[in-house]
């Protein structure tokens, strides 16, 4: 174009779904290899940076997979960051520490208390673009603040559960819709209000 910009579609969900339906993978081994290849390619593309790069590590499957592939393709230890909680029932830092040790990353932990979490709640509307019902936004913000002093780019496993259906709500949503989708909207609204009042 005359100003040096070209407008082009980078990615299309509709095209991806259409292509996937036409070229279904029926072999588990092929699916695993394609997934690994796609993840490695994505990580390599995201790792092209002229600034220090690291990752957020929770010890869960998603972030552990990302960090594992990063470390596998890195010539030096990847810097990993995790948030730990003083309350044992919320603390997953021990899992992250074990994964970091196994992978040989340069691991940094920050522990937070309930008061640390409460202190940033008032700032959340300014930090995030839109409201969302995920309490992980608090530790995510804190780990970002922690990592900022060490690096400018960090990869994470965020979105893995949504992408791979890791939450039961995604499994049940379609089943529930198949049962009640035919009902008129006013009746669905009444049912929704009743369901949300159940403790």
What residues fall within each predicted segment?
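Predominantly a core beta-strand signature of beta-propeller blades
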Residues: 4-8, 106-107
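Short acidic-glycine loop/turn motifs at beta-strand connectors
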Residues: 1-4, 159
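Short beta->alpha transition motifs characteristic of CBS
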Residues: 9-14
């Amino acid at each position: 174009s005359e100003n040096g910009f070209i407008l082009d579609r980078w990615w299309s969900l509709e095209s991806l779904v259409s292509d996937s339906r036409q070229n279904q993978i029926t072999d588990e081994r092929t699916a695993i290899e394609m997934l690994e290849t796609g993840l490695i390619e994505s990580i390599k593309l995201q790792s092209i940076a002229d600034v220090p790069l690291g990752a957020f590590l929770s010890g869960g499957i998603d972030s552990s997979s990302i960090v594992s592939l990063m470390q596998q393709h890195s010539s030096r230890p990847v810097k990993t960051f995790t948030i730990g909680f003083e309350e044992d029932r919320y603390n997953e830092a021990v899992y992250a520490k074990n994964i970091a040790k196994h992978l040989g990353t340069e691991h940094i932990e920050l522990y937070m208390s309930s008061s640390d979490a409460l202190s940033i709640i008032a700032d959340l509307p300014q930090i995030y673009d839109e409201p969302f019902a995920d309490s992980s936004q608090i530790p995510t913000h804190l780990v970002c603040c922690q990592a900022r002093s060490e690096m400018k780019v960090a990869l994470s496993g965020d979105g893995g559960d949504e992408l791979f259906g890791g939450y039961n709500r995604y499994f049940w949503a379609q089943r529930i819709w198949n049962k009640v989708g035919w009902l008129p909207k006013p009746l669905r609204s009444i049912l929704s209000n009743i369901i949300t009042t159940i403790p």
